[in-house]
Amino acid sequence: MAAKDVKFDTDARDRMLRGVNILADAVKVTLGPKGRNVVIDKSFGAPRITKDGVSVAKEIELSDKFENMGAQMVKEVASRTNDEAGDGTTTATVLAQAIIKEGLKAVAAGMNPMDLKRGIDLATAKVVESIKAASRPVNDQHEVAQVGTISANGEAQIGRFIADAMQKVGNEGVITVEENKGLETEVEVVEGMQFDRGYLSPYFVTNADKMTAELEDVFILLHEKKLSSLQPMVPLLESVIQAQRPLLIVAEDVEGEALATLVVNKLRGGLKIAAVKAPGFGDRRKAMLQDIAILTGGQVISEDLGMKLENVTIDMLGRAKKVSINKDNTTIVDGAGEKAEIEARVSQIRTQIEETTSDYDREKLQERVAKLAGGVAVIRVGGMTEVEVKERKDRVDDALNATRAAVQEGIVVGGGVALIQAGKVLDGLTGENPDQNAGITIVRRALEAPLRQIAQNAGVDGSVVAGKVRESDDKAFGFNAQTEEYGDMFKFGVIDPAKVVRTALEDAASVASLLITTEAMIADKPEPKSAPAGGMGGMGGMDGMM
C-alpha cells in the first residue's frame, strides 16, 4: 500500500479552498447574458468553446492532490445540479464557493463547524420553502420561450425553437437535440409513433424521389417471431387483397423466401405491402410491439399466447391512417387504437418510470411514453464551424432542460433576484446559539453571490446592484444585465425555473457543509522519482585507435 500524506486543520482547509476557488473562478465567468466563453483544449480536434458551467467544471483536474479534492467536491455540486435540474450548474457553483469561503473564515475564527452546518441547513430549508411559495406556473408559450432564451445566454431564437417544439409534442413529448450539417437551426416534428427500423428491401419504396414507402389507410400485422415462409398467412393475405388496403408487416425479421415472395407481389402490383423489423431487443421488443398494438388497435401475434399465423383474421390487425418508412425509420400516424387504452398504457409505463433505478431504463421508458402520448421533435443545431455548432448545442441542451424544469415546478423571477427575495425570510430567523446564527448569516450573504457575479460579468459593480435589489420591496424588481437597466424582471422576460434555483441552492449548501466540517485530508504521497539508468562509461581510450 502506498504511503499517505495527511493534512490537518488550517493547512487542509486552506489547500481545499484554493482548489475550490480555481474551479469556481473558471466556471463563474460564464454566468449571465454577458457571461464570457471558456476555451477547453482537446487531445484531438479543435478546442471546445463553451458557456456551459458543468462542461467547464468536468475538465478541471489539479496537480496538487489536496487542492484537487476541493475542486472535485465543487465539481460534484455542478454535476448533481445538472443531473437533477439539467441547468443552473454555474449558479450552484457560485453559491457553493460563497458558502465555503465564508464558512471557512468562521471556522478559522474559532466557531464550531457542526453548529455552522446546522445553521446553514436551517437557513437553506427556509429559503427553499420561500422559493417554492414564490413560484408560479408557466402560463403560455411566450413564457416557455423566455425561459429558454435566458438559459441559452440570451439567444431568443433558441428559446423560440424550444417553445415551438414543446407546443407541438406536448410536455410529455420527446425533444432531441442533434447537430445539423447545414448553417441553419431547424425543428422537425414527427407526429405519431416513430421507431428506428427502416424497410427491409428498397423494392418496397413507393416514392422514388424521397426513397420512402408511404402506405395510407393501412393494416398492420405485428408478429413476435421471424417470418421465413408466407405459407401460413396466405388466407390472411387474400383477405387483405379483397379489402384493397395496403399491409405493413412488423416482425422480428422477414427473410429468405418470405421476403422474396412479398417483393415479387409488390412488383407485380398485386399487393401494396412493406415489411420492417420490430424495434428494440428482448423484453423491450415485446413491450414496444404491445405499444404499437395498443396505438393501432391490433394484437401482437405471439406464440406465448398460443396464437398461430394461420389462425389470424383481418380484425386482429392494427390500423393506421398513414405509415411512412425510409431506410432508417418507420412512422405510424393516427393509429386506430382506443384513447382510453392508450391512456391506461401510458399510466402503466409512468408507474414503471417511478419504480426504476436505472437512468438508461428511465430514458427508454420516457421515450415510449412520448411516442404514445405526444410525438417526437428534433432540434437540429446549425452553425458556420464545428466549434460553433458544439457551443450552440450545449446552450440548446441547457435551455431545453430549463424549460422542462419550468413546466414541472413553475417559474420565479430571474437574474439572481429570486434568491435575494427568498433570503428575506432569514431576517427574523435565529438558531440555538451564536454559531448557528453565523451559519444563517453565511447563507444570507451567499444568496447575493449569483446576482453580484451576473452584474460583474456585465461590467457593473455587483455590490451596488445587489444593494439596490435587496432594498426594494417589489419582489419582481431586479437588474437586467442584457440591457443594464433596473425594473420588473417579469416584464423584461428574465425568468428562471423554480426547480433550477431550488436545486442549485440545495446542492451547493449540501456540499459546502461537508467541506466546512472537514478536519483532515488524506492523499497518496507522490512516488519518489527513480534515478536514471547509468550510461556506458567514459570510453576514454578510443582516440588512440583512430
UniProtKB/Swiss-Prot annotation:
Q: What is this protein called?
A: Chaperonin GroEL
Q: Which gene encodes it?
A: groEL
Q: Which residues bind ATP?
A: T30, L31, G32, P33, K51, D87, G88, T89, T90, T91, G415, D496
Q: Where is this region: Disordered?
A: 526-546
The reaction(s) catalysed by this protein are:
ATP + H2O + a folded polypeptide = ADP + phosphate + an unfolded polypeptide
Protein family membership: Belongs to the chaperonin (HSP60) family.
Q: Where in the cell is it found?
A: Cytoplasm
What the protein does comes down to: Together with its co-chaperonin GroES, plays an essential role in assisting protein folding. The GroEL-GroES system forms a nano-cage that allows encapsulation of the non-native substrate proteins and provides a physical environment optimized to promote and accelerate protein folding.
Q: InterPro entries under this entry?
A: Chaperonin_Cpn60_CS, Cpn60/GroEL, Cpn60/GroEL/TCP-1, GroEL-like_apical_dom_sf, GROEL-like_equatorial_sf, TCP-1-like_intermed_sf
- Record's superkingdom? Bacteria
Q: Which GO terms describe its biological process?
A: protein refolding
Which is an annotated GO molecular function term of this record?
Answer: ATP binding
Q: Which CDD domains does this entry report, sorted A to Z?
A: GroEL (cd03344)
- Which Enzyme Commission number(s) are listed? 5.6.1.7
- Mind listing the UniProt keywords for this protein, alphabetically? ATP-binding, Chaperone, Cytoplasm, Isomerase, Nucleotide-binding
Q: What does the subunit comment say?
A: Forms a cylinder of 14 subunits composed of two heptameric rings stacked back-to-back. Interacts with the co-chaperonin GroES.
Under the heading HAMAP family, the entry gives:
CH60
